[in-house]
Structures are given as structure tokens and as C-alpha cells.
């Protein structure tokens, strides 16, 4: 009877410890599978399957000095690679509405958009798009330090990446390439329910006197009317060399309709213009994206169809893309 009591006490203690550990540490993951087909005038056409798997571990703890510490990382596995990549990590100290982080590929960023859409943006669905979702000057993707402040119904972020060449796992001995990256972003609703606003500016310092600094700014606004949502944004990027500066500007509009809790439809239009050494391209790139998304509970599936005129600003180079994506979270 005594041994049974000791065993019961031990099991109860182990259960309590295990429950505490689970409350503090979180394990998450997902698997994304994509089929894409393309048809490009005067170019390559094809189809293929791709898979991406992610496993993440995160934890948080209240410190003795009153601050809260949060930390975690994510391992990405791709179908065409035998190795995993630690492309995401963060260590955050926070107090009230202010937090400080050392991180990579973490926190709010300028590759996201407030413009309503279904699943992937056009820059992901369309291969070879002139102005993709992510600018080279997006400091979010590099090892960086970051200050976040909750204000004005949203979050204000100040970010600095001392070395833009460091985007994967490295050590403290990594050599600085001389390309530092600084960024400021606000996203939130300004205290208005249904409103979404995004504004940001990023600058990547040029490497060498013959190159231009890469400057990127983005402004977007959207409103959710219930079942309907609509929005627009504008993106601009200056890059290239001093002798041949490249300027791009993309204006995008999008609407979505939620038929019910599981089924949604989306439509977006984007027009991109390009200047090289001050001379505007004769052909603006135009993209129409139509999307449908359905949530089966443990499985999400979306279909996107994109039609592009003057792909890459090349006259009469029109293209069509069709993508099916499934994502399972665990």
C-alpha cells in the first residue's frame, strides 16, 4: 500500500511538471504542397510539384527583473533539399507595450500586404514578375535588431540589420559585407475597427561607390465591410548603379468575398511601371489574379489563376499561371 501511494505521488508530480513544461514551450508545424502550371508566350512553359515543411519551437518566461523573455526558431525542410534550414529565429525582451528583439525573418515586414487576397500574392504565383513581393531592401530577412512599440492602434517597428549578406545560420565570426539595412514600419487600424493600414520605408546601403543605395517604400490601406473586404497599396523601389538607376512602381487593388466561414473568393489587379536611367519602359506589366480558398478544418486548399500582360515589361510576352496549394497545420 505504501509503495502504491509513493508511485501515485510520483506520477502526479510528473504530470504537474509535464503540464507546466507544455504551458511554457510550444511546438508547431505545417506542411505545404503546391502544384503550379504556366504558359508563357516566347518563353518557358511547364508544370511541377513542390513541398515545404516547417517545424517550430518557441517558449516564454517571466524574468526576475520584471521583463518577459520570448524565444524560438523554425526549421524549414524543402522537397528538393536533404538538409533543413534555420531561416527563422528570435529572442525578444518585452515590458508592457515595448519590446526589443534579435531575430531573422521574424516580426512585421514589408513583404506582407493589407490588400485582401486569397493565399499567395501575385508575386508568388507569377514566376518572373518584374516587382515581386520581397524587396532586396527588406531588412526583415536578415539578421537584425528590432524595437517594437504598440501605439496608434497598431505596431511601430524600427529595425537595423548590420550585414545584409547574413540570411542563414552563421556564427559571431561572420564578416561584415558593408551593406547595412535600416527600416521603419507601421501597421494597424489607427483605432478604427475594420481598417487596416501599412506604411514603411527601408534602405539598403550600397556596396561600393558605383552602386546606388536600394530604397523601398510601401503604403497600403484596406477596409473590411463584413463579408466583403477591399484595399489598395503602392510600392516603389530605387536600385541599380549610379550610371543606370532602376526605378519601379507597382499599384495594386484587391477585393475578397467570404461566402461563409470556410469559402472565400478574391480578385486583384496590379500594374507595374519601370524606368531605367530615367527612361520609362514602353510596356507596363499588368497582372490579374483570381483566387478561391476553402477550409476543410484540418486541411486548407486554395486555387489561384493569374493572367499577365507584358511579363517583365517585354512587349507581347503574355503569360498564364495556375496554382493549387494545400496546407496542413499541426
Where are the model-predicted features located?
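Outer-membrane beta-barrel proteins
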Residues: 1-330
Amino acid at each position: 500500500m505504501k509503495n502504491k501511494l509513493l508511485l501515485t505521488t510520483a506520477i502526479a508530480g510528473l504530470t504537474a511538471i509535464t503540464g507546466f513544461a507544455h504551458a511554457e514551450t510550444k511546438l508547431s508545424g505545417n506542411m505545404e504542397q503546391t502544384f503550379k502550371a504556366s504558359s508563357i508566350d516566347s518563353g518557358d512553359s511547364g508544370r511541377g510539384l513542390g513541398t515545404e515543411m516547417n517545424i517550430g519551437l518557441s517558449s516564454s518566461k517571466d524574468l526576475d527583473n520584471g521583463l518577459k523573455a520570448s524565444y524560438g526558431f523554425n526549421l524549414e525542410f524543402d522537397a528538393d533539399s536533404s538538409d533543413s534550414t534555420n531561416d527563422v529565429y528570435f529572442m525578444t525582451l518585452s515590458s508592457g507595450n515595448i519590446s526589443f528583439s534579435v531575430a531573422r525573418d521574424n516580426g512585421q515586414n514589408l513583404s506582407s500586404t493589407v490588400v485582401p487576397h486569397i493565399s499567395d500574392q501575385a508575386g508568388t504565383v507569377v514566376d518572373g514578375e518584374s516587382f515581386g513581393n520581397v524587396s532586396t531592401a527588406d531588412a526583415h530577412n536578415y539578421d537584425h535588431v528590432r524595437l517594437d512599440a504598440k501605439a496608434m492602434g497598431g505596431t511601430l517597428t524600427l529595425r537595423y540589420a548590420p550585414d545584409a549578406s547574413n540570411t542563414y545560420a552563421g556564427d559571431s565570426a561572420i564578416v561584415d559585407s558593408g551593406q547595412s539595412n535600416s527600416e521603419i514600419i507601421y501597421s494597424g487600424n489607427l483605432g478604427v475597427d475594420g481598417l487596416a493600414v501599412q506604411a514603411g520605408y527601408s534602405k539598403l546601403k550600397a556596396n561600393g561607390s558605383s552602386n546606388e543605395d536600394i530604397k523601398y517604400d510601401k503604403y497600403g490601406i484596406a477596409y473590411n465591410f463584413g463579408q466583403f473586404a477591399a484595399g489598395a497599396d503602392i510600392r516603389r523601389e530605387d536600385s541599380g548603379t549610379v550610371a543606370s538607376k532602376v526605378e519601379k512602381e507597382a499599384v495594386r487593388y484587391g477585393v475578397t468575398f467570404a461566402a461563409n466561414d470556410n469559402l472565400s473568393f478574391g480578385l486583384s489587379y496590379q500594374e507595374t511601371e519601370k524606368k531605367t536611367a530615367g527612361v520609362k519602359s514602353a510596356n507596363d506589366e499588368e497582372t490579374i489574379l483570381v483566387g478561391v480558398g476553402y477550409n476543410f478544418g484540418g486541411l486548407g486548399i486554395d486555387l489561384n489563376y493569374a493572367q499577365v500582360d507584358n511579363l517583365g515589361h517585354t512587349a507581347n510576352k503574355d503569360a498564364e499561371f495556375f496554382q493549387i496549394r494545400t496546407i496542413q497545420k499541426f
